[in-house]
């Protein structure tokens, strides 16, 4: 089974420390963000590894290790009142998560053997992630988040990591899509 050290390396990505605030005082196009986030959500939820239905094993320290995976929490200002008062912190949190998952989808966990999907939806996920993150952070930035070199020894280990990452990604983009849906409905002039 994949060691807890490898899982911790995956989850300890410095996604919170290296990002900067979403630029500018103006908000993004909520309608464009809503459309892209809905597309991303659809792609993420239709993405299934080609291994059939596999339940990842539960790990004892699962709650501890998932603390480092991007989540949109109550204190992130993504609630209706928080978005109305100042949406920048929420948008920053969503941007950080998008960059985190974009880098994971480009890592050898998803590009290595065995192939994840027969038709290549990972490239569609990448394109949608890039489009949405550019709406939130249109300026070129100098930092590159680092992803630890995590190469599972066995193909089955890679498959389990993929399932775990996809589940976390699905939950993240579902909440982000709801945030952008609310923003498009209530914050668009």
From Swiss-Prot:
Keyword Disulfide bond: yes
Chain segments annotated as coiled-coil in the UniProt record: none
MF-aspect GO terms: cytokine activity; interleukin-23 receptor binding
Superkingdom of origin: Eukaryota
UniProt signal peptide: 1-19
InterPro entries linked: 4_helix_cytokine-like_core, IL-23_alpha
A Pfam entry, by short name: IL23
Broad class of where this protein is predominantly found: secreted
Cellular component GO terms held in the UniProt record: interleukin-23 complex
Subunit structure: Heterodimer with IL12B; disulfide-linked. The heterodimer is known as interleukin IL-23. Interacts with IL23R; this interaction enables recruitment of IL12RB1.
Family label: Belongs to the IL-6 superfamily.
Record's function text: Associates with IL12B to form the pro-inflammatory cytokine IL-23 that plays different roles in innate and adaptive immunity. Released by antigen-presenting cells such as dendritic cells or macrophages, binds to a heterodimeric receptor complex composed of IL12RB1 and IL23R to activate JAK2 and TYK2 which then phosphorylate the receptor to form a docking site leading to the phosphorylation of STAT3 and STAT4. This process leads to activation of several pathways including p38 MAPK or NF-kappa-B and promotes the production of pro-inflammatory cytokines such as interleukin-17A/IL17A.
Protein name: Interleukin-23 subunit alpha
Species assigned in the record: Cavia porcellus
């Amino acid at each position: 089974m994949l060691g807890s050290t490898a899982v911790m390396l995956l989850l300890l990505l410095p996604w919170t420390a290296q990002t900067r605030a979403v630029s500018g005082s103006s908000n993004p196009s909520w309608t464009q963000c809503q459309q892209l986030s809905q597309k991303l959500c659809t792609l993420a939820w239709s993405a299934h590894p080609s291994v059939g239905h596999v339940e990842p094993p539960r790990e004892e320290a699962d709650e501890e290790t998932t603390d480092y995976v991007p989540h949109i929490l109550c204190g992130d200002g993504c609630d209706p009142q928080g978005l109305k008062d100042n949406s920048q912190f929420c948008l920053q949190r969503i941007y950080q998560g998008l960059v985190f998952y974009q880098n994971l989808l480009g890592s050898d966990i998803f590009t290595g053997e065995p192939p994840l999907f027969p038709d290549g939806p990972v490239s569609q996920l990448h394109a949608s992630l890039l489009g949405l993150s550019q709406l939130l952070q249109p300026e070129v930035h100098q930092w590159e988040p680092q992803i630890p070199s995590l190469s599972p020894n066995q193909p089955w280990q890679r498959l389990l990591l993929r399932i775990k990452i996809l589940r976390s990604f699905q939950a993240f983009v579902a909440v982000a899509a709801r945030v952008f849906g609310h923003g498009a409905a209530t914050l668009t002039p």
